[in-house]
Amino acid sequence: MAATAAAVVAEEDTELRDLLVQTLENSGVLNRIKAELRAAVFLALEEQEKVENKTPLVNESLKKFLNTKDGRLVASLVAEFLQFFNLDFTLAVFQPETSTLQGLEGRENLARDLGIIEAEGTVGGPLLLEVIRRCQQKEKGPTTGEGALDLSDVHSPPKSPEGKTSAQTTPSKIPRYKGQGKKKTSGQKAGDKKANDEANQSDTSVSLSEPKSKSSLHLLSHETKIGSFLSNRTLDGKDKAGLCPDEDDMEGDSFFDDPIPKPEKTYGLRKEPRKQAGSLASLSDAPPLKSGLSSLAGAPSLKDSESKRGNTVLKDLKLISDKIGSLGLGTGEDDDYVDDFNSTSHRSEKSEISIGEEIEEDLSVEIDDINTSDKLDDLTQDLTVSQLSDVADYLEDVA
């Protein structure tokens, strides 16, 4: 029974298989499956042939470079860099691709070949870093040296000119003062030297007790002594007329900033325009006789009458001349000075009284002008003695 049952089942399976195949063929599915299987088999066979006949990847330029000594040195430096920082994955790709699985040098051999000396047990970084540092030092070495030379050249020239200028400016001033000192005549009095020192001061008020004002007023009172003083001043004026361009030494002094007063009155002389500049230059060292009338001892105030003012001024001048005579200034050579002055001067014969009267008239005119302008605080009288030539002199009255 069992055998018959198995035979029946086998027949039924065969019928079902045939029925399935027939159904698949009728629908076209079976043929499509057969074609796909056949294509897959053919593709597998083709792929197998390609893999067997495939050539290895080779970079010809890299291969030629690595065949040289420098090429192997560079590849060894890169491999040492990757090994120093434990870049294993990158190293696993680098070595097969460059075909450098073997033949690369270690760190010690590289350091010896490059001339890098390392202390035992001390590793500061990869050898590639040390090579770059040495290249930078070689590049910066000449430039820094040139820069140092340039800096020395830049800073050194200014020092030498400064030294030269300082050496030149100091002696340039000394000969000027020495030259002026040598050009002074030996016959100059002590009072004249003090008068020259007084010219550098802005406040030139005259007092009766100072020998400076005594010597300057002595020039106004005695005509004979004026001749000797003017002869000495003329020599200084001629010498200093050539030194007039050196006006830098005169800067800073208020006396030289004031304009030179114009002469208002002359006494019996003729003007010579050619020598006027020299005569004015001779007055540069003479002190201006600026003094307020109220500052003179015994002089009345400005509110007194005009006649009393003139008389008091004349009395003061006589007093000063007497005091200077008592001090012994200008004595001993008065007769010679009188002879020289009288022989060479072209002045009109005027006595001290006539000159005093003219001074009194000038003072009266000046006081009238001051009274009309309501400026009665101070009156400054500048009596300047100068000489336009060797044979003439004049007096200036400046309010």
From Swiss-Prot:
Main localization (coarse): cytoplasm
Subcellular location: Cytoplasm, Cytoskeleton, Microtubule organizing center, Centrosome; Cytoplasm, Cytoskeleton, Microtubule organizing center, Centrosome, Centriole; Cytoplasm, Cytoskeleton, Cilium basal body
Bias kind Polar residues: ranges: 163-172
Any single Gene Ontology cellular-component annotation: centrosome
Listed GO MF terms: protein homodimerization activity; protein kinase binding; protein tyrosine kinase inhibitor activity
Pfam families documented for this protein: FOP_dimer
RNA-binding is among the record's keywords: no
Residues with site note (Breakpoint for translocation to form CEP43-FGFR1 or FGFR1-CEP43 fusion proteins): 173-174
Mutation effect (residue 74 to F): Abolishes homodimerization and leads to aggregation
Biased composition (Basic residues): 175-186
Ranges of Acidic residues composition bias in the record: 245-256
UniProt keyword Phosphoprotein, yes or no: yes
Phosphoserine found at: 152, 156, 160, 202, 301, 326
InterPro entries: FOP_dimerisation-dom_N, LisH
Residue segments, region Disordered: 139-218, 232-308, 331-353
Complexes and interactors: Homodimer. Part of a ternary complex that contains CEP350, CEP43 and MAPRE1. Interacts directly with CEP350 and MAPRE1. Interacts with CEP19. Interacts (via N-terminus) with CEP350 (via C-terminus).
Name by which UniProt lists this protein: Centrosomal protein 43
Lineage: Eukaryota, Metazoa, Chordata, Craniata, Vertebrata
